[in-house]
Amino acid sequence: MSLQPVPHRLLFSDSDDEEDGHSTGEDSAFQESDSPVSRLREKQEGPGGSWEEEEGLGSSPIKSPGHFFMCDSPTYRDLPPASPPGPAASPPDCPGTPPHKTFRKLRLFDTPHTPKSLLSKARGIGSSALRFRGGTLFREAEKLPKPEFTYSTPQVNINPFTPDSLEIQSSTGLCRRRKRALLNDSCGEDMEGSDCELEDEDVRPAKRIPITESNMKSRYATEFHELEKIGSGEFGSVFKCVKRLDGCIYAIKRSKKPMAGSVDEQNALREVYAHAVLGQHPHVVRYYSAWAEDDHMLIQNEYCNGGSLADAISENYRTMQYFTEPELKDLLLQVARGLKYIHSMSLVHMDIKPSNIFISRITVPNTGVEEGDDEDCGSGNVVYKIGDLGHVTRVSSPQVEEGDSRFLANEVLQEDYTHLAKADIFALALTVWCAAGAEPFPTNGDQWHEIRQGKLPRVPQLLSQEFVDLIKLMISPDSEKRPSSMALVKHSVLLSASRKNAEQLRIELNAEKFKNALLQKELKKAQIAKAAAEERALFPDRIATRSTTQSNRTTRLIGKKMNRSVSLTIY
């Protein structure tokens, strides 16, 4: 009697939970003793049963998607067709059903696809890194580099100039410890140690400048039409642009080099932080937005049609025409107002110089002076604005980066940061003196030290002694003796009788009106008291008779605190 091979059919349990179909690679990498098929085989065949007897799988009336993947395999095509099962070979309790989800756990979509090879493969990948399922269809995805660890915390920047930034930074330490513990627990044996070792700043990651915009259109080219290049510096170039949507002109500052990881990156972010905190002020260049393109930072600022103060000074040198004393006082007063606003926010500029002061010329009909006009325009409708906030720092926790050495105070060079606001006053004095016609200041040497000792260089014009004394006071070697920005905006030299602004005149007028009202009130009281005293002295009998008549009059109380006389009319 010839023996026919008895085909074996894999049995799968239906008791698996639904979520097993979504398990990871580690869940599907099972051991032979843990497999439900092995347990069933042990019951049916005993210890002599072996996976090696398996030669093929029974056909199913419904083909799974994996069938088409296996058909492409050369090993699958070379297999002989399975013999049709006989009546005695088909287990009555295992009808032909579609492949169960446990079937996918066997990873039969790869070749070779014998149970023994699958188990050995499962053991091999059980302790390795997680991989994609799906066999050759997703084989290309496995070749991709390992994606970076994703954080649940969104990437945001912490503005160091906001009032609540200190509170956020103080609470960051606790969050770092908690998140580090969670990350250490989540790192398994299959992950490299470098994946779990995170820096402190990675726990709350900051949004960095580099942004991949290969699939995005340039915002600069889409939203703005470039007119001309109006300036350049260490940071980059400034372009005059028209926004296509509103038709207004803006100044777009673009960094020269890619800023990702460079020293200028922090300066650019510091400028954006300072602009966002300061908001809008008449004597600070207005900020609108900032973004990054191809690792370059772009900042959209207000366009000042008068250029910079440095350009005006260069033109004055060429034409031998300098700022007059009233113009110098107006320049000093307006920039002092801008510094007063910056200092009131507990910030310091740290880079005041002619190239960072911009001029805006406003054409306004001559309709008279109104309230508040002093903050919007100076003499001749010229407004001076402070710009380039890349060196701004906080007074309480300074991170000082030295600006231009020609306008740098000596105490900053000596790393004495106790009076940083007075360093801005020192730089402002030299800026005004430069506009007065002084020669360009040295970057070092004996003349540099003479200026720090309070000696001003000569200027080609005659200025009043009180104005010169004010400039000398602003560059005093003792920083404590220098006037503050608050004192400058109220200084008598800058607010002379002929140059008092409308607000100052209104305040003085209201004060005089209040004094006049008080005097009139006191005068009226004195007049009433004097008249009463004279009446008592001249007519004492009349006053006594009047009081007696009023007391003898019959009255009746009606209502609350109301006396009415009783009258009777007889018809």
From Swiss-Prot:
Catalytic activity: L-tyrosyl-[protein] + ATP = O-phospho-L-tyrosyl-[protein] + ADP + H(+)
Keywords assigned: ATP-binding, Cell cycle, Cell division, Coiled coil, Kinase, Magnesium, Metal-binding, Mitosis, Nucleotide-binding, Nucleus, Transferase, Tyrosine-protein kinase
Family annotation (InterPro entries): CC_SR_Kinase (IPR050339), Kinase-like_dom_sf (IPR011009), Prot_kinase_dom (IPR000719), Protein_kinase_ATP_BS (IPR017441), Ser/Thr_kinase_AS (IPR008271), Wee1-like_protein_kinase (IPR017164)
Record-listed ATP binding positions: 230-238, 253
Subcellular location per the Swiss-Prot or TrEMBL entry: Nucleus
Single GO cellular component term: nucleus
Predominant location: nucleus
Bias type Pro residues, positions: 81-98
Domain Protein kinase span(s) in chain numbering: 224-494
EC number(s) on file: 2.7.10.2
Residue ranges the record marks as coiled coil: 500-539
A Pfam family this chain is assigned to: Pkinase
The organism's place on the tree of life at top rank: Eukaryota
Gene Ontology MF, one: ATP binding
Region (Disordered): 1-101
Entry keyword annotation includes Transmembrane helix: no
Tissues of expression: Zygotically expressed. Expressed in regions of the embryo that are devoid of mitotic cells, such as the involuting mesoderm.
UniProt: Mg(2+) binding residues: 356, 388
Residue positions of the active site: 351
Biological process terms in GO annotation: cell division; mitotic cell cycle; negative regulation of G2/M transition of mitotic cell cycle
Family, per entry: Belongs to the protein kinase superfamily. Ser/Thr protein kinase family. WEE1 subfamily.
PANTHER family, per the entry: EUKARYOTIC TRANSLATION INITIATION FACTOR 2-ALPHA KINASE EIF2-ALPHA KINASE -RELATED, WEE1-LIKE PROTEIN KINASE
Functional summary from the UniProt entry: Acts as a zygotic negative regulator of entry into mitosis (G2 to M transition) by protecting the nucleus from cytoplasmically activated cyclin B1-complexed cdk1 before the onset of mitosis by mediating phosphorylation of cdk1 on 'Tyr-15'. Specifically phosphorylates and inactivates cyclin B1-complexed cdk1 reaching a maximum during G2 phase and a minimum as cells enter M phase. Phosphorylation of cyclin B1-cdk1 occurs exclusively on 'Tyr-15' and phosphorylation of monomeric cdk1 does not occur.
Protein name as catalogued: Wee1-like protein kinase 1-A
Organism for this UniProt entry: Xenopus laevis
